[in-house]
A protein has these predicted regions:
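Residue-level marker for buried hydrophobic side chains located in beta-strands
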Residues: 33-35, 62-64, 117-118, 210, ...
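A short C-terminal boundary segment appended to hydrolase-like catalytic domains
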Residues: 303-368
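Short acidic, glycine-rich surface-loop motifs adjacent to enzyme active sites
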Residues: 199-221
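Positively charged n-region of N-terminal signal peptides that target proteins for export
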Residues: 1-4
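Active-site glycine-centered loops adjacent to acidic/histidine catalytic or metal-binding residues
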Residues: 38, 66-67, 120-121, 213, ...
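Extended active-site neighborhood of metal-dependent phosphoesterases/phosphodiesterases
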Residues: 32, 76-204, 223-255, 262-307, ...
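N-terminal active-site segment of His-dependent metallophosphoesterases
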Residues: 22-93
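Bacterial N-terminal signal peptides
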Residues: 7-17
Length: 368
């Protein structure tokens, strides 16, 4: 499988050739990072624009929160690429290509920008497994930043995992794996407790940013979250409570990021359940990397922000105090590069932005 050179060149140049204006320059004590998830269906069209915008905003890294490719069916962008357009695609051939397609067409445009890749539930849809994901994405899961942190925590921990963390610029970034119905496992919970214990006593850590695929339970979007399975609900509530206690004990900032639901929402833990059980932690859903867009949930009016039929990413600006400002950066059809339009055709780009939606009926069973 090959990517058209002109499309790749255009995307890479878009990332590399931007010169920030004075208004975009950050003070020496501020820096930015970019986050989104769910880039199946139309991610090959949308993600190059996200990469270009992340570079323009001087993001130190991009963090993907999982669901890279559909796996249960052929992604529309894969079907619409020049190599496959108008052809009948056998499922086995698609499965063989799917993750390489993601790496080439979605990660490639980030160029030299560091990328952290999280696992989502679509990465474990049969015949795919967590072990296959870990093997394919070993380059990212065992990147020097993650390997160094893992060995600093435990010199015997030589095997990369699908949950991980790293400390950067005073922030402990933590990725939790809730891709299957047995998570959070006791092993992962024990690992997280160790991370939180070290962060509590580490004066250099001023904030936690905890990312995962499905949102923790009892949010305003609980209908497509860790509420979907008993172990998820129980262990997810324990994690939320531990993070609440961490914040109260240390007075350090705590932020929660998820995707899984294909819309943008902030203030997702402003729910009656958490108001009655310890309080709200700042939380966001940003499943806006190219997947079919879903209707907003019934309680979305209680959120600070709630938008659907949008693509984009969350841009975090880290301040010296550890406080992080988050804002949603939308990418529009007009942001699509000429190379991407040429590769996928104007008609398919129009489909992605205008008709890649599933608002009337649920797009899929819960946590499929």
């Amino acid at each position: 499988m090959k990517i058209i050179p002109s499309a790749a060149l255009t995307a890479l140049l878009a990332c590399a050739s931007v010169v920030p204006t004075a208004a975009q320059q950050k003070s020496a004590s501020e820096w930015t990072f970019a986050v989104s998830g769910d880039s199946r269906n139309c991610g090959d069209v949308v993600m190059p624009s996200i990469a270009a915008a992340a570079a323009k905003n001087q993001a130190a890294f991009y963090w993907h929160l999982g669901d890279l490719r559909a796996i249960y069916a052929v992604d529309e962008d894969y079907q619409s690429s020049p190599e496959h357009r108008g052809k009948v695609i056998e499922k086995d051939a698609y499965l063989k290509d799917a993750w390489d397609d993601f790496i080439q067409n979605q990660l490639g445009p980030f160029g030299s920008m560091p990328v952290f890749v999280g696992i989502g539930n679509h990465e474990t849809i049969p015949p795919r497994t967590r072990e296959q994901f870990a093997a394919t994405f070993a380059k990212w899961l065992d990147a020097p930043t993650l390997s160094k942190q893992r060995l600093a925590d435990d010199p015997q921990d030589t095997t990369p995992k699908t949950y991980f963390h790293w400390i950067q610029g005073g922030v402990d970034f933590i990725y939790l794996d809730n891709a299957t119905f047995d998570q959070f496992s006791p092993e992962q919970m024990g690992w997280l407790q160790g991370v939180l214990g070290r962060a509590s006593s580490n004066k250099e850590v001023r904030a936690l940013v905890v990312g995962m695929h499905a949102a923790l339970p009892d949010s305003l979007a609980s209908g497509h979250s860790m509420n979907d399975w008993p172990t998820g609900a129980e262990s997810g509530r324990r994690v939320y409570t531990e993070l609440l206690n961490f914040k109260k004990k240390t007075h350090k900032h705590v932020y929660l990021l998820a995707s899984h639901s294909h819309f943008y929402m902030s203030g997702i833990f402003n729910s009656a359940s958490w108001k009655a059980n310890g309080g709200e932690l700042p939380g966001w859903i940003v499943g806006t990397g190219g997947a079919v867009r879903y209707a907003l949930p019934p309680d979305s009016s209680l959120a600070k922000e709630a938008r659907t039929k949008v693509y984009g990413f969350l841009l975090g600006t880290v301040h010296k105090s550890g406080e992080i400002d988050f804002r949603f950066h939308e990418v529009n059809k007009a942001d699509t590069s000429a190379g991407t339009i040429e590769r996928y055709t104007p008609e398919f780009v129009n489909f992605c932005f205008d008709r890649n939606t599933a608002f009337v009926e649920p797009a899929e069973p819960a946590h499929k």
